[in-house]
Swiss-Prot record:
Belongs to the bacterial ribosomal protein bL33 family. Keywords: Ribonucleoprotein, Ribosomal protein. Pfam families: Ribosomal_L33. GO terms for cellular component: cytoplasm; ribonucleoprotein complex; ribosome. InterPro entries: Ribosomal_bL33, Ribosomal_bL33_sf, Ribosomal_zn-bd. GO terms for biological process: translation. This is Large ribosomal subunit protein bL33B. The lineage of its organism: Bacteria, Bacillati, Bacillota, Bacilli, Lactobacillales. Transmembrane segments: none annotated. The gene is rpmG2. GO terms for molecular function: structural constituent of ribosome. Coiled coil: none annotated. Disulfide bonds: none annotated. It comes from Enterococcus faecalis (strain ATCC 700802 / V583).
């Protein structure tokens, strides 16, 4: 399986703070993780973008 890079964007302010390698296999939904956003200065939900 090949891997691609996906950016994780803050759901509050929209800034793309993190990048992650994900496999291109059978994935039904996008990745959602609670991470720290340095612009919001709090832990928020980060969603996978292209």
């Amino acid at each position: 399986m090949a891997t691609k890079k996906a950016a994780l964007a803050c759901s509050v302010c929209g800034s793309r703070n993190y990048s992650k390698s994900v496999s291109e296999g059978k994935r039904g939904e996008r990745l959602e993780i609670n991470k720290f956003c340095k612009y919001c200065n709090q832990y928020t939900l980060h969603k996978e973008t292209k």
